[in-house]
């Protein structure tokens, strides 16, 4: 493997799995105090756009990294929205 590919894989791994600790904590505790809904909506819009880009370019590294990111970050947004709705009911 060349240096460019290794650098890309290194970056993809850490940016993808950066959401794992927050996702695990939120799923376990259901505590979403301090979570920004706007940030997660904007972020997930970007992730979905990257998935579309990966499909159009047949770039499986981009595609896989962003699919994993989607599955790590989306539960945080969903739980946050559920909790906010419960507060207002």
Curated annotation (Swiss-Prot):
One of its GO terms (molecular function) is sugar transmembrane transporter activity. It is found in: Cell membrane. Keywords: Cell membrane, Membrane, Sugar transport, Transmembrane, Transmembrane helix, Transport. The keyword Phosphoprotein does not apply. The chain crosses the membrane at residues 4-27, 35-55, 60-82. Changing residue 66 to A: Impairs sucrose transporter activity. Changing residue 53 to F: Increases sucrose transporter activity. Pfam families: PQ-loop. One of its GO terms (cellular component) is plasma membrane. Gene3D superfamilies: 1.20.1280.290. It is a multi-pass membrane protein. Residues 7-59 form the PQ-loop domain. InterPro entries: PQ-loop_rpt, SemiSWEET. The keyword Transmembrane helix applies. This is Sugar transporter SemiSWEET. It comes from Escherichia coli (strain UMEA 3162-1).
